[in-house]
From Swiss-Prot:
Compartments (UniProt record): Cytoplasm
HAMAP family: Pole_loc_TmaR
Cellular compartments per GO CC: cytosol
The UniProt record lists the keyword Coiled coil: yes
Matches recorded under InterPro entries: DUF496
Official protein name in the record: Pole-localizer protein TmaR
Coiled-coil residue windows: 13-43, 76-96
Role summary: Pole-localizer protein involved in the regulation of several cellular processes.
Keywords from the UniProt entry: Coiled coil, Cytoplasm
Length: 104
């Protein structure tokens, strides 16, 4: 019976991670769009149009968004790995439960 509870618990955790993964992928998309926006902005701003400080600020903002994208990609990989581990554990528990039930 404990196996059933663990299977349910693991399945719920897996579903939670799936939702978190989808949310994280949305953040990756959003930040990629911001990076593209800032790249376009850098194409339009010329040194004779504005101060060099503005260029520096925009470049820093772009780098920050790129870092965020990288962080979200890493987090997605970690979440995916956790989900795979949970799926593997659920399969193992299910198999153990089947074997235990078959022996009775």
């Amino acid at each position: 019976m404990n196996t059933v509870f663990e299977i349910v618990s693991q399945a719920r955790r897996k579903n939670k991670l799936k939702r978190e993964l989808l949310d994280n992928e949305k953040k990756v998309r959003d930040n990629r769009k911001r990076v593209e926006l800032l790249e376009n902005l850098l194409d339009y701003i010329k040194p004779n149009m504005s101060q060099d400080e503005i260029m520096t600020i925009i470049k820093n903002m772009k780098a920050d968004y790129e870092d965020r994208v990288d962080d979200h990609i890493i987090k997605s990989a970690e979440i995916s790995k956790a989900r795979r581990d949970i799926s593997r554990r659920i399969r193992e528990l299910t198999e153990e439960d089947k074997q235990a039930s078959g022996k009775k």
